[in-house]
């Protein structure tokens, strides 16, 4: 669901078309598991079987350790005003477990994953990491996302897994960001920690940006110049700092 914006490790989420659906209506007039159904949910125009969850949500069947981590992630997301929604399976294409939309600052997870605590937590970590990527790219107030881990921090098996999942699906441009999120989803507590850093405005200190992302952040005024980046010139390609319409 992303398209390549520049060659520096940033991307934009594709904008879904607005659907003429009455708020609160279910998707009986839309095909189950279709992109139209997904878009209707993302726009919060189809809300039957969809609920927003907060830190006080009770995860039935989760062991305390997993429930605690899930709650920490949701607490941090609440702090930066990113909504987390559980949606009926019919809203999701069959290949999709969850999705984060940086242009709306909300993400959605399939309801049936609640029956699989490990799968749910993994998806929550993964989509939460896309929120961290959003924060890395100048904050969640814009729709850019940037890779968080440096390439040498991501194991080769993770890169191979991302290539298998997304390359074969024709989404090769998304592989760097998806490998980034897959690696985070395999680490206990990492997403919660990074989201808390985002909320506390310490993300760049705790997770130094990649060199090209750092250069872009400074050029666009999202980050103060330092070290070899000073003195610097304002980004000459101002269109790289402004979301495409």
What spans do the regions from the language model cover?
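Positively charged n-region of N-terminal signal peptides that target proteins for export
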Residues: 1-4
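Metalloprotease/metallohydrolase-associated module, dominated by Zn2+-dependent proteases
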Residues: 80, 144-245
């Amino acid at each position: 669901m992303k398209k390549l914006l520049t060659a520096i490790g940033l991307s934009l989420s594709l904008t879904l078309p607005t659907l003429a659906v009455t708020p609160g209506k279910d998707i009986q007039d839309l095909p189950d598991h279709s992109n139209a159904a997904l878009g209707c949910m993302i726009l919060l125009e189809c809300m039957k079987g969809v609920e927003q969850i907060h830190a006080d949500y009770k995860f039935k069947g989760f062991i305390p350790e997993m429930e605690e981590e899930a709650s920490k992630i949701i607490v941090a997301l609440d702090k930066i005003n990113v909504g987390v929604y559980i949606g009926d399976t019919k809203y999701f294409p069959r290949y999709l477990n969850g999705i984060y939309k940086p242009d709306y600052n909300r993400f959605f997870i399939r309801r049936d994953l609640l029956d699989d605590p490990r799968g749910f937590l993994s998806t929550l970590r993964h989509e939460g990491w896309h929120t961290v990527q959003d924060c890395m790219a100048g904050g969640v107030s814009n729709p850019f996302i940037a890779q968080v881990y440096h390439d040498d921090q991501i194991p080769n098996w993770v890169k191979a897994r991302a290539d298998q999942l997304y390359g074969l699906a024709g989404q090769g441009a998304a592989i760097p960001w998806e490998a980034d999120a897959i690696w985070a989803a395999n680490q206990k507590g990492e997403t919660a920690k990074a989201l808390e850093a985002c909320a506390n405005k310490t993300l760049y200190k705790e997770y130094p940006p990649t060199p090209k992302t750092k250069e872009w952040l400074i050029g666009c005024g999202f980050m103060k110049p330092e070290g070899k980046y000073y003195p610097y010139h304002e980004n000459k390609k101002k269109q790289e700092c402004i979301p495409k319409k």
